[in-house]
């Protein structure tokens, strides 16, 4: 919340992280990166007694992460931007774009 406030005070856009923070400073938060913990919990409870423990990866294909679009940022995100985002998302989901898995080797390929 502090970074969103600082960005709003400086009249620059920010991006919220983990949950939808667009409402905190309408028109100043470009979007929020969503970590869909709500969906993960719902899915776990839905499995009931058949729940298997361990790692359960929920990426773009499983709607485990995403971005927020709502009345608070609708004027900031154009249809062209959404189209491009969805196109790139589809490329990640279908494997056309490879996203490095940090958990696989504890490294980041970007220096």
Can you say where each PLM-predicted feature lies in the sequence?
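A residue-level marker of the well-folded mature domains of exported/periplasmic proteins
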Residues: 1-111
């Amino acid at each position: 919340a502090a970074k969103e406030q600082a960005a709003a005070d400086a009249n620059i856009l920010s991006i919220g992280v983990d949950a939808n923070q667009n409402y905190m400073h309408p028109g100043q938060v470009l979007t929020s990166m969503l970590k869909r913990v709500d969906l993960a919990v719902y899915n776990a409870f839905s499995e009931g007694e058949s729940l298997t423990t361990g790692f359960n990866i929920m990426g773009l294909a499983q709607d485990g992460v995403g971005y927020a679009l709502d009345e608070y940022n609708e004027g900031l995100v154009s249809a062209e931007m959404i189209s491009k985002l969805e196109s790139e998302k589809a490329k990640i989901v279908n494997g056309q774009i490879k996203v490095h898995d940090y958990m696989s080797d504890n490294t980041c390929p970007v220096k």
